[in-house]
């Protein structure tokens, strides 16, 4: 499936996009021909900016081939979005989170001054350290949920602990959403439906 998404947003604090000795963030000639796009080149934050902004001011940086936040984000700051708008997509990313960390990947967010945070307009794939978060979590707040909306079967997904790499994927196909964590389906729903 070709990537075509409406702005993604990420919340700090968070480490995103895996890097090891394998060359990541590259496309094969076939993937290029099929229309796939990279959202991160492994070296720069080109293609990203602050939510409702024209440039990227932080707290994000590239460290050893990964996008990382400095941990200074808050509920009202630290959100970055893609420069390009998309519609339907298949997005896969590797990530790890710091001990006690809380973050998320939001999509189809609306950028307008009256919406200073992305979670009031777009669904959030929750990324959080369930074990070490400072406050007790409700099921709708746990890692892998469609935040405050749809819950996975927590018995069928495995989230690696803080500091270890996980892989997540979201497929958005004409309003039908399927999410995955480490190869296991977490949630499936229809966006903008009466239930949603």
What spans do the regions from the language model cover?
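Bacterial Sec-dependent N-terminal signal peptides
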Residues: 1-24
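Carbohydrate-interacting regions of secretory-pathway proteins
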Residues: 19-196
